[in-house]
Regions:
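Conserved N-terminal alpha-helix of the aminotransferase class I/II PLP-enzyme fold
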Residues: 12-58
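N-terminal glycine-rich, Lys/His-bearing helix-loop that initiates the first secondary-structure elements
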Residues: 1-13
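Solvent-exposed, flexible loop/coil residues
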Residues: 5, 21-24, 30-31, 123, ...
Length: 288
């Protein structure tokens, strides 16, 4: 294995290997993959960072599985409090893991309505109080930030509410892997207080499609085996080594002046926004 024997029309077949001696194993990593993940952990400033070759969808299921494992025993039917603009991967996870969802809806006058679904800390606190009045305690709070229009939630304020209620905050940060590398300082969910977070590296970083990160904050007590088992539960036993190698190569990119390059990119985007607004006011969304 693989059947192409390292030869084929694409030209990348020689890099497409499987779990052989010296190549490590993603869900039991202790060699080169574990070392690469340790490098990513340092780059992102997290407690622990793990690789996925099946996108944030795999990470979403894994972090929800971990959150369910952390809930108190005999806590009743599990329910998750989630902003309504969640990706369908959350719905698939709810079906697989058998939990209920209590939606957080945007305010009636919120700009962007359902696509952005801004959630204020006060609204989250009220929603938690309403659930408590029903005798229900969610096993976590789930946000999508940034959303599909680039809106970033007040993760710091929302995480403070979650932690005051003893709940973990889970963030789908699929579109925001770059947020840790902003020149003015990190706006990544983990640094803002999130407990579990996923990034689709392939969306905003130089990584092959399917490459994603599962990040853990310092408050998550799950051991190494539990996290890897959670990922393995929803992943293929034949993870793509091409995707893994592209993630490792991206580590080198992130470590080599990436903040400065990202700042130049943001400046160019700002110029483009101003030019578009000059053509028609409101045509370009503001940068966040």
């Amino acid at each position: 294995m693989p059947g192409h024997k390292g030869r084929g029309p694409l030209g990348c077949e020689e890099l497409d290997i499987t779990e052989i001696a010296g190549a490590d194993e993603l869900y039991e990593a202790e060699g080169i993959i574990a070392q690469s993940e340790a490098n990513a952990t340092q780059l992102f400033g997290t407690a622990r960072t793990y690789y996925s070759t099946e996108g944030s969808s795999q990470c979403i299921r894994a972090m929800l599985h971990l959150a369910l494992q952390m809930r108190p025993a005999k806590a009743g039917r599990p329910v998750l409090l989630a902003a309504r603009n969640a990706h369908k991967a959350l719905l698939y996870a709810a079906a697989l893991l058998d939990f209920d969802i209590q939606w957080l809806w945007p305010a009636p006058d919120a700009a962007g309505a359902l696509c952005t679904c801004p959630v204020e800390p006060e609204a989250l606190s009220s929603a938690l109080d309403e659930l408590a009045a029903e005798g229900r305690t969610p096993f976590g709070v789930y946000l999508t930030s940034p959303d599909y229009l680039g809106f970033v939630q007040d993760v710091a304020g929302l995480s403070a509410v979650c932690h005051a209620h003893g709940l973990p905050l889970l963030v789908d940060n699929a579109h925001g892997a770059y947020l840790h590398f902003l020149k003015e300082g990190s706006r990544h969910p983990i640094q803002m207080g999130a407990d579990l977070c996923c990034d689709s590296a392939h969306k905003t970083l130089p990584v092959l499609t399917g490459g994603a990160y599962l990040h853990l904050g310092p408050s998550v007590q799950a051991d190494e085996a539990a996290v890897r088992n959670a990922l393995a539960l929803f992943g293929s036993t034949s993870p793509s080594y091409l995707i893994l190698q592209s993630r490792d190569a991206a580590n080198a990119v992130l470590a080599d002046g990436f903040r400065e390059k990202l700042d130049i990119c943001r400046w160019r985007l700002g110029m483009l926004c101003r030019e578009l607004d000059a053509l028609r006011p409101g045509l370009a969304l503001p940068l966040t």
